[in-house]
């Protein structure tokens, strides 16, 4: 089984250089799979993102693995292109591709500019922290849980399928960004305070329905 996690352009905004993002997320990733196929590897576990659903996250309460993809960030666009190519590749080469779409992940090793590391840094310095999207609802999922799911999903004897299969990786416990921030702000016992902005603004909802989530067995 080849497990593919490589990605460029992963950030809070997902709007890095499109050419560079496509080079890694589509062109080089496709070459990797073709090389593996030429060496008789037929099982692939590919990690993607809920950002593929894009604009649908504005008006859909929960996302299904059958939801239409409609990305609007460069990162989301690149991953959607690659996912579509994977579907065709699985049929043309009669291989098995299991696509795992990650919902918002936090924990050890994440980029220093993301929400939790930024919040932790401000808390340790005793400074105030601005939450710009407090009303946004996300399926916050710990990296430890993601690891358990990927190990379990790499067993292709589970949930057998013919060529192409999609599942979500999510702890399925949606909360607002405000609730998430307050939880960790309290843990860090900081002297600073949280400043909440744009509370009435329309935000995306990165929330999976229960039936689309891979359950560890």
Task: Walk through the language-model features, giving the residues of each.
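SDR active-site strand-loop-helix element
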Residues: 2-8, 44-50, 100-102
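Glycine-rich NAD(P)-binding loop of the Rossmann-fold in SDR/ketoreductase-type enzymes
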Residues: 16, 20-31, 69, 73, ...
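Flexible, glycine-rich beta-alpha linker
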Residues: 53-54, 70-74, 98-115
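Active-site Tyr-X1-5-Lys
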Residues: 58, 70-98, 123-124
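Conserved Rossmann-fold NAD(P)-dependent oxidoreductase catalytic core, especially the SDR/UDP-sugar
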Residues: 30-74
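NAD(P)H-binding glycine-rich loop region in Rossmannoid oxidoreductase-like domains
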Residues: 1-24
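C-terminal substrate-binding subdomain of Rossmann-fold SDR/epimerase-dehydratase oxidoreductases
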Residues: 123-217
């Amino acid at each position: 089984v080849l497990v593919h996690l490589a990605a460029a352009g992963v950030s809070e905004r997902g709007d890095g250089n499109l050419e560079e993002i496509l080079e890694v997320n589509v062109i080089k990733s496709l070459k990797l799979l073709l090389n593996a196929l030429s060496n008789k590897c037929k099982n692939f576990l590919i990690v993607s993102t809920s950002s593929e659903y894009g604009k649908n996250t504005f008006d859909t309460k929960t996302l299904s693995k059958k939801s239409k993809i409609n990305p609007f960030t460069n990162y989301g666009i690149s991953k959607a292109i690659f996912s579509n190519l994977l579907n065709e590749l699985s049929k043309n080469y009669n291989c098995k591709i299991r696509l795992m779409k990650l919902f918002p992940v936090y924990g050890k090793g994440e980029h220093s500019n993301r929400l939790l590391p930024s919040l932790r840094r401000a808390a340790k310095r005793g400074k105030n922290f601005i939450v710009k999207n407090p009303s946004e609802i996300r399926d916050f999922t710990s990296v430890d849980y993601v690891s358990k799911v990927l190990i379990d999903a790499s067993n292709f004897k589970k949930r057998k399928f013919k060529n192409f299969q999609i599942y979500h990786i999510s702890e399925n416990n949606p909360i607002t960004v405000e609730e998430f921030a307050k939880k960790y702000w309290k843990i860090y016992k900081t002297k600073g305070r949280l400043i909440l902005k744009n509370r009435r603004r329309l935000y995306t909802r990165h929330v999976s329905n229960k039936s689309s989530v891979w359950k560890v067995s």
